[in-house]
């Protein structure tokens, strides 16, 4: 099982990955902090997944961009906002490449 979500759904996916037995989490537009309040970081939620996590955020996301960490890969799409809507195929390609590289998954 690979679970994921966008924005607050990405937070839920990270917080519930352990309970669901997810092999990995895809976190699109993870809201690192409320806009203008970097002191209210939610970075700890990413590590709650306790599995591989891919975060795809836009370079212009007002919710911030998390740092890479062990088991947490961060892809930043240039010019994208929190919506990730300018070039969705770029986010799809990044997610597909990451999924293809995860050991233990069955690929069609």
Regions found by a protein language model. Give the residues of each.
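Gly/Ala-rich beta-loop-alpha elbow adjacent to hydrolase catalytic centers
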Residues: 5-13
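Catalytic histidine-centered segment of alpha/beta-hydrolase-like enzymes
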Residues: 80-92
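Short beta-strand/loop motif that positions the catalytic acidic residue
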Residues: 48-50, 55-57, 61
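Short beta-strand immediately N-terminal to the catalytic nucleophile in serine-hydrolase-like folds
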Residues: 3-5, 28
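A conserved short beta-strand
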Residues: 21-36
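Aromatic pocket-lining residues of Rossmann-like dinucleotide-binding sites
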Residues: 16-17
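Acidic beta-to-alpha connecting loop that harbors the catalytic carboxylate
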Residues: 59-61, 78-81
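Short, conserved loop/helix-junction motifs that constitute active-site signature segments
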Residues: 20, 43-50
């Amino acid at each position: 099982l690979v679970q994921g979500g966008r924005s607050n759904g990405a937070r839920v996916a990270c917080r519930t990955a352990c309970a669901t037995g997810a092999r990995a989490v895809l976190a699109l537009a993870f809201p690192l902090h409320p806009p203008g309040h970097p002191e209210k970081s939610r970075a700890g939620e990413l590590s709650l997944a306790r599995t591989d996590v891919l975060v795809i955020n836009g370079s212009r996301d007002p919710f911030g961009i998390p740092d890479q960490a062990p088991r947490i890969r961060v892809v930043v799409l240039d010019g994208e906002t929190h919506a990730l809507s300018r070039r969705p195929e770029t986010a799809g390609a990044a997610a597909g490449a990451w999924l293809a590289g995860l050991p233990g998954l069955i690929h069609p």
